[in-house]
Amino acid sequence: MKIVITGTNGFIGKNLLNELKDSNEILEINEDIFNVEDWYNEIYYKLNKFDPQVVFHVGACSDTLETDVNYMMTRNFEFTRRVAEWCQLLGRKFIYSSSAANYGTNDEYPSNLYGWSKYTAEQYVVKCGGVALRYFNVYGPLEDQKGKMASVAYQMLEKQKHGQEIKLFPKKPQRDFVYIKDVISANIFAMENYHENMGQWYEVGSGDERTFEDVLDILEIPYTYHDEKDIPKGYQFYTKSNPMNWMTEWKPQYNLENGLKDYLKHI
């Protein structure tokens, strides 16, 4: 099968590429596409020349602290819009990597530019008949290039490696930590069951809310706590996927304990 994957230099895209490359013909599209002045026509040229049956659109600016509106919307909305329209026009499968950042701090509206860019793109994808997957807190192998956007598990392991003190917020934030292998299985499930799920968004998570303390206790990493006054304004203290919003018949296979155990084999 001929498949396009965007963002294969990134964490999720690289894992998806590794899963699919041995049995499919893959075209990779990455950030360097924006080095071309007429980048949107360059995208159409690549898509038309390769003529894929499936497009996994994983690539995006994932920096939740980015404040440049033009930069963010070009990469996260305009790029998505053009690929979604191409897939709709030619009847190709389009699977979009969305985000739980769509929910913001009150489950209603995104609370930052990244969240808004992903939310607006997701709404367009659904309108075009694609499948959007809202990932929660993804962790796993190959996330080292994410820097400050890497998972809590990766960042804490790095701090331990370099002998740095680890401090947590005293209010005990809870997150839905989802292992990368479950994210990849959700993408493949969406591809294989596309027509039943097209024109919809779905959540991809473990379905469990766990604390940062849980992560560190499983990894056997010691920690202390910040003062209450150190908590950033607007900090999100709770996320959890709802199994009612998962794709029918798709289920995660890893809880936090099993996911971290498998993760440690790759570090």
Annotate each language-model stretch with its function.
Residues 39-75, 104-105:
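NAD(P)H-binding glycine-rich loop region in Rossmannoid oxidoreductase-like domains
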Residues 9, 61-63, 99-104, 136-142:
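Active-site segment of SDR-like NAD(P)-dependent oxidoreductases
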Residues 113-115, 119, 123-175, 180-184, ...:
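NAD(P)-dependent short-chain dehydrogenase/reductase
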Residues 163-267:
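C-terminal substrate-binding subdomain of Rossmann-fold SDR/epimerase-dehydratase oxidoreductases
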Residues 57, 81-113, 131:
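Conserved Rossmann-fold NAD(P)-dependent oxidoreductase catalytic core, especially the SDR/UDP-sugar
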Residues 71-82, 112, 116-117:
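Glycine-rich NAD(P)-binding loop of the Rossmann-fold in SDR/ketoreductase-type enzymes
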Residues 26-46:
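Adenosine-cofactor binding site in Rossmann-like domains, unifying the SAM/SAH pocket
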Residues 3-20:
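N-terminal Rossmann NAD(P)H-binding glycine-rich loop of SDR-like oxidoreductase domains
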